[in-house]
Amino acid sequence: MNRRDFLGILALGALLNFESFNDLAFAQVNGSLQGSELFANKEFSYQALRALSKTYSSCADIKECFLAIKSIKDGDTNSWFEGWKAQGDRLYSLAEEYYSEGFLVSARESYLRASNYLRTSGFFLGANPKDPRIFDTYAKSRSSFVKAASLFDPKIESVEIQYQDTTIPLYFVKASNDQTPRPTIVMVGGFDSNAEELVMDWGFGAIKRGFNFVAFDGPGQGRALILQGLYFRPDFEKVSKPIINYIVTRKDVNLKKIAMFGVDLGGYFAPRACAFDSRIALLVADGGVFDYYSSLTSLLPPVAKNLLETDKAAFNKAMAEALKDNITFRWAVHHGMWAFNAPTIADFFLKTKPYNLKNIISNINCPTLVVNSTNTFFFKGESKKFYDLLECPREMINMTASEGAEEGSQVGALGFAQGVIFNWLEYHLNKIVG
């Protein structure tokens, strides 16, 4: 590689300072924050909105979120950790107090908010998985959720599913206290989600509509990654089959009405599961991911992509320099290195190559809904590509700014998103006889 090429790859640092990076395209005019922007830093804004959006399911409160936001120095990840952790710790202590006094509804709601804020506090720690705060904060966030789960009626069940020589955690949220066989939604998270958050964002909305709801941490996600050291794997059917095997043993599940719902990178995992399991009757991909490597490397200038394939050492050096001043991409790459068990930046990129549906998409036979958030960034264009190549009955819905639902995973517009997606599921599940 000559000096000119190396200078070109170093320019990647400038290219990574996207004004609309990671699902946000808020305007900043004359130094004032406009629209929904909560921080000048785009990733801080998106993650704060992610926490705040859980007010829809009573897993956040507006002023508590604003107290955290107000205490945070924009762009300072340590300040972010302290600001959200303070709220999480306060709510956890309050929940413990309520519980000891027998105020169980108040305890449950406070545990849920504590879990959300503690998860949020640890978000940027994923850029350094050796930071011990990751493990302590996640463990407390999960513990808070599990305590809340025990206070529902019916209780949210915590189940351990046998996986290889260990187990993976699953939550089963029943629609009712009886044993009536009901339609069941199995939700698969993405690159940085955990099962607790899936229940908060989607599970409570599902049971209102008479669906059972299942969420789990697969390898590379939540507890499986943070506390067990299990990493992402492309052959996700090896993960999903034990989950479905468990679900079909339950008397409260209608075996003909099992739907798989994947969000973010789950838009690859869920279709993969459906391609290998005919027991799944419906698929929702929010949004679809046809080829992870192609999508990820499309963010790179041509010289960088070429370098990735030909000179890993030079690519690593240039990328490390480029990431210094970009919080979002630095977090994404370093978290990816951790979740994919990749020793270097180049290895992370290259390890995404097998994550594609090229040879199996024709095996997806169930009716499929593809959800495309129009302001997504990492998987831009993937939903349309996935939709176009499907051979099964399919529909695609665009989530747009006019509905407030344009962000990835419809953060900030969960009520609207639930209406659209759950209505589609309800309509198609009702058409299935049995």
Question: What are the roles of these predicted feature ranges?
Answer:
Residues D5-F26:
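N-terminal export signals
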Residues W84, A139-N177:
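N-terminal cap/lid segment of alpha/beta-hydrolase-fold proteins
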Residues Y231-K251:
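Alpha/beta-hydrolase active-site loop
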Residues A275-P343, N372:
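Hydrolase active-site cap/lid region
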Residues I364, V370-N372:
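Short beta-strand/loop motif that positions the catalytic acidic residue
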Residues F377-E382:
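Conserved alpha/beta-hydrolase "acid-adjacent" motif
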Residues L390-A405:
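Catalytic histidine neighborhood in serine/cysteine hydrolases
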Residues S402-G415:
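Catalytic histidine-centered segment of alpha/beta-hydrolase-like enzymes
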